[in-house]
Design a protein with these regions (language model features):
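Short, basic/aromatic recognition patches
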Residues: 1-13
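Short beta->alpha transition motifs characteristic of CBS
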Residues: 31-37
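Short beta-strand scaffold segments in enzyme catalytic cores
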Residues: 19-24
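Local cysteine-cluster metal-coordination motifs and their immediate loop/turn environment
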Residues: 73-86
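Hydrophobic alpha-helical segments, chiefly the membrane-spanning helices
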Residues: 126-131
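Iron-sulfur (Fe-S) cluster-binding segments and ferredoxin-like electron-carrier domains
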Residues: 84-99
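Conserved small/polar residues in nucleotide/adenosyl-binding loops
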Residues: 114-119, 123
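A short, polar/charged loop-to-alpha-helix boundary motif
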Residues: 39-49
């Protein structure tokens, strides 16, 4: 986690939101990143997103199920979605984010229950009753 804190300090020095992330595979750090939304003028340039991309390129596969993500703050819904889609094996964060956290702080993307109507039901619900 210390490496993630160091990345957060780098973000702060660069006038970014001070969040850092590290991806570990087989006990080796394979990716480090910090927020770069202002620097890159990119709202998706969060530490977790960048670190996940670097890790996938390093491994040569988008599936990161053998990896661990260490991040200084609970990932937002976008970053939480990326951890789910990349199949990160474990996520460790220093503190919850009750306003924007996607893994329990504000919302729990990893354990949402949902129902989805069949396509026929969706079609029916859009048609007026007189049709």
């Amino acid at each position: 986690m210390q490496h993630a804190y160091n990345e957060a300090i780098s973000a702060w020095i660069a006038d970014e939101v001070p969040i850092g992330a590290v991806v570990v595979h087989d006990e080796q750090i394979i990716a480090t990143a910090h927020n770069q939304t202002r620097t890159q003028n990119d709202p998706t340039a969060h530490a977790e997103m960048i670190a996940i991309t670097i890790a996938a390129n390093h491994i040569g596969d988008w599936r990161l199920n053998e990896c661990k993500l260490f991040v200084t703050k609970e990932p937002c819904p976008m970053c939480s979605g990326a951890t789910i889609m990349s199949r990160i094996g474990e996520v460790h964060f220093s503190f919850e984010d009750p306003k924007m956290g996607g893994l329990g702080g504000a919302i729990s993307l990893h354990c949402l229950l949902y129902t989805s109507p069949s396509p026929r039901d969706r079609t029916r619900s859009r048609m007026p009753s007189s049709a």
